[in-house]
UniProtKB/Swiss-Prot annotation:
Subunit text: Homodimer; the beta-strands of each monomer intercalate to form a hydrophobic core, while the alpha-helices form wings that extend away from the core.
This protein's name: Translational regulator CsrA 2
Matching Gene3D superfamilies: Translational regulator CsrA (2.60.40.4380)
HAMAP family (alphabetical): CsrA
Role according to the record: A key translational regulator that binds mRNA to regulate translation initiation and/or mRNA stability. Mediates global changes in gene expression, shifting from rapid growth to stress survival by linking envelope stress, the stringent response and the catabolite repression systems. Usually binds in the 5'-UTR; binding at or near the Shine-Dalgarno sequence prevents ribosome-binding, repressing translation, binding elsewhere in the 5'-UTR can activate translation and/or stabilize the mRNA. Its function is antagonized by small RNA(s).
Species this protein is from: Coxiella burnetii (strain RSA 493 / Nine Mile phase I)
Amino acid sequence: MLILTRRIGESVIIGDDIKITVLGVKGNQVRLGIDAPKDISVHREEIYERIQQEKLAQSEDQGEKTDEFE
């Protein structure tokens, strides 16, 4: 894991087209601004995990439906 130190207003560039800027720090929370192309999904980790669980459940449901027709 790469660890970087940034101050408010400073940024990190990922690849050629993703920019993450530190907007603020308050207590143990950091506000980040993320500039990325529209075709790049950006989610908080807990939201991403929920999306992955929903996709897994849907694929399992599809598998059960396929089994019924065999």
